[in-house]
Amino acid sequence: IDECMAIIRDLSEEIHSDFGPALNAEVSKMIWELTGGKYERVVVDNELNLRVDTGERFVDCDQLSTGTREQLYLALRLAMVKLLFPKKDVPVIFDDSFVFYDDRRLARTLAWIGSQGFAQVILFTCQHREMDALERMGVEYTPIYLD
């Protein structure tokens, strides 16, 4: 078992060294866009822990507000989608992903997602905030109500 664990650790480090720089660059670009330039650089370690450059120092993700953390996790997930599926021909699915976003952050995020060229965006929510934000921005969408 110890030998297997060592092999897994080595493979994880190898994957991170190959994939890590591109992932860091993509997450950093996305978080800069999502936060309106507030955060410019993110570092993702080989265990997918996130640290953000505040301009003065690097801060662990858990020291940031819940809304900012959620934006970081969104950027991480979408950066992985972009890097693993560069043609963007896969749908992206969100299931109550924006419950910790304030209205301004929600509107900016929905507009940003719409600008990314994903083939299809599926958004599950138990709230009307997302629909209200899309309507205010004049974005077309097709609601499907589940019972």
Predicted regions and their residues:
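Hydrophobic, well-ordered secondary-structure elements that form the walls
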Residues: I1, I31, L72, D95, ...
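Charged, surface-exposed helical/loop "interaction arms" that form contiguous linear patches used
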Residues: I1-T35
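Long, charged, glycine-rich C-terminal linkers/tails
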Residues: I7, G36-G55, V90-I93
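Conserved ABC ATPase signature
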Residues: E13-N24, L50-L78, S97-R104
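ABC transporter NBD signature
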Residues: I31, S65-G67, F85
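Loop/turn-to-beta-strand initiation segments
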Residues: E70, K88-V90, G117-I122
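Substrate-binding beta-hairpin/strand module that engages nucleic acids
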Residues: K87-F100
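C-terminal lobe/lid and adjacent interdomain/linker elements of RecA-like ASCE P-loop ATPase modules
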Residues: R104-D147
